[in-house]
Structures are given as C-alpha cells and as structure tokens.
A protein has these predicted regions:
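Short, solvent-exposed secondary-structure boundary motifs
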Residues: 44-52, 100-109, 166
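Extracytoplasmic/secretory soluble proteins
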Residues: 3-8, 16-17, 37, 89, ...
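Aromatic- and charge-enriched surface segment that lines or borders ligand/interaction sites
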Residues: 58-100, 118, 124, 134-135
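Surface-exposed binding/hinge segments that line
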Residues: 60, 105-166
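N-terminal lobe/hinge region of extracytoplasmic solute-binding protein
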Residues: 2-63, 70, 92
Length: 166
C-alpha cells in the first residue's frame, strides 16, 4: 500500500499519509477514543455497567478455568470474514507484548493463559488458577482484521515497537 497525502479541500497542506491518524488531542489516553470507535471487542459494557455481547455472541464458563466464547458470523469493514481464527490472531499478537495496556498491567492476560480456535466460531480460553476479571480484560482486547495487523498495526514508527501503543 502506498501512502498518499490527504489534502485539505481548501487547498491547504497535506495532513499525512492515508494510514496515519493525526491526533491533536494532547491527552495521554487519546488512543481510547480511536480504538473504541474503530475496532470491536468480544464484549462491551452498557450504560449500566452490564456486559453485553460484541463480536462474541455468547460466552460461558465450562469450569473454573475454561471460558468458551461463541463468535458472531461477521465481516470486517474491509470485507474480510471475522471468525475464531481472527480472535486467536488478536490474542496472540497482544500476548507478544510485555505490557500491552498503558493504563495498567491488571488489564493484561497472564502469560500462561491459552487461546484455542476450536472451530470457525468457537474459542476456548484456559486460565490456569482462574481469572475473575477475564470478561473485563476481553473488553480491552481489540480485534482488528489481518489488514490492520499486516499494514498498520500499533507500531510506533519512532521506536519500531507496538509496546504500550494502543
């Protein structure tokens, strides 16, 4: 993909390549506004703080350590199908980072958590010892398409790393 400048219709200067989000909000958590408005998660929280389905249409605990999610039959905005393999890709990518959540490590999945795509729509996550915050953590695990991971990602061009940049 070639980067192309986005021009101001009034004849102003280019604002940057088309795959760059130019942010003028000085807040250190401005990335929340971007990710929560451009990506989906397995679940969401409604205005009353109650967990609601997102890309996972349902979930259940099989035992105290195993969470099973049934993923929606869905398609990304770029036309790529969403399925259990895409969920696993997102999980694997985030688990590569030491501390993917800038607000705090309490949002990270433990290193011994495993994720298995059982079939096209089923995910099984195993939490050795259990994790009462698992559903909250899923709310913060963004599930972009492969195009995002392959072309854009969360990599900071200054550091060459995605560590803590979402």
């Amino acid at each position: 993909m070639d980067a192309q400048a986005t021009w101001d219709p009034g004849g102003g200067q280019p604002w940057g390549p088309h795959n760059t989000v130019t942010v003028v909000d000085p807040s250190p958590v401005n990335w929340l506004s971007i990710t929560w408005n451009t990506m989906e998660e397995a679940n969401r929280v409604d205005h009353d703080g109650i967990g609601q389905p997102g890309l996972a249409e349902s979930w259940r605990w099989l035992d105290k350590e195993t969470l099973e999610l049934t993923m929606r039959d869905a398609v990304y905005q770029d036309g790529e199908p969403f399925n259990a393999a895409m969920f696993k890709l997102g999980f694997d990518k985030v688990q590569e980072w030491t501390n993917p959540h800038p607000p705090g490590a309490f949002l990270n999945f433990a290193r011994d958590v495993t994720c298995e795509a059982v079939d096209e729509r089923t995910i099984r996550m195993r939490f050795p010892g259990g994790d009462s915050a698992a559903l909250m953590k899923l709310r913060g695990m963004h599930l972009p398409s492969t195009r995002f991971w392959n072309e854009w990602g969360f990599v900071d061009p200054k550091t060459g790393s995605a560590e803590g940049h979402w």
